[in-house]
Amino acid sequence: MYTIGQVSEMFDIPVSTLRYYDKEGLFPNLERAGNIRRFGENELELLRIIECLKKTGLEIKDIKRFVDMVQEGPSTYAERRQLFEARKERTEQEIARLQRALAMVKFKCWYYETAQKDGGEERLAKIIPDGL
């Protein structure tokens, strides 16, 4: 079992964020010893999933719905799969967008390195299509 401070350090997540998650019901089976939250392996695994879903842009209310589905059991497998399929598609689209941006950044690095070596952009203007 881990304290909220230990979990905060392990995941590099502020204690206030963990408290917020708890307040929002994202840790339905979180044990308490008095006023001290005790995180077990199940909560750590759930936190990994929560952070993953957050990184894909899912809102807390929708993450809460996922947590509720897990609590409901196997009857929600199809809905959970659908959630992750949608997250996968969104993440793949975001990766593609970032890859295009990275390609442009790499091109501009090359472009300005070449312009610097050449002492200007004249040669580049002749070999590169308009619009770049």
Where are these regions (language model features)?
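Basic helix-turn-helix/winged-helix DNA-binding cores
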Residues: 1-67
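A generic structural signal for solvent-exposed, polar alpha-helical segments
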Residues: 8, 26-27, 45, 72, ...
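Alpha-helical structural elements
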Residues: 15-16, 34, 61, 72, ...
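Amphipathic alpha-helical dimerization/coiled-coil segments
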Residues: 55-87
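C-terminal regulatory/oligomerization modules of transcriptional regulators
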Residues: 75-132
